[in-house]
Amino acid sequence: LDVLKQSTSKLLSNDALELSIMITDNYGLDSNYIAMAWFSKADLYIEQLQFDKAFSLFDSIRINYPFHSLSDEILYKRARAMELQGKWQSALDFYSDIVKFYGTDILADNALFKSAEILETKLNQTEKALDTYKKLLTEHPGSLYIYETRKRVRRLRGEEIEKEDE
């Protein structure tokens, strides 16, 4: 994965970093890697837009490994799958569960940012989006999304954004 992380392709590099973090966060916590294998297969199904198959595998993980550390990643992947299908409220529900049950985990700030983005750009609920962005700023000050979040808050407030900030 280190070679992929150094790739010049931003998307490939970001995907490699995301995968590396997910593996580091969940690998080796138990000696049974079946849940990780099922998760990987479900992730592939999402990429192939085979959502029912993916969700079936996610359900199998939840049933067979109810306290596995992949639980927050499963919610995140479900939310992303809902976004791919244009099911914005369902995506928001999954993101909300991440914040509610895994608020201090690595995906909490991602879930808040994605929620605010959906509220702002897909559902045109600017006040709720603004509140969600503010929550991200206060609860996750070290987030990688801080710079973009500040820009969006200023824009939603109607403040002037300098050219270099765009």
Report each predicted region and the residues it spans.
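Acidic, polar-rich low-complexity tracts and alpha-helical solenoid repeat scaffolds
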Residues: 1-166
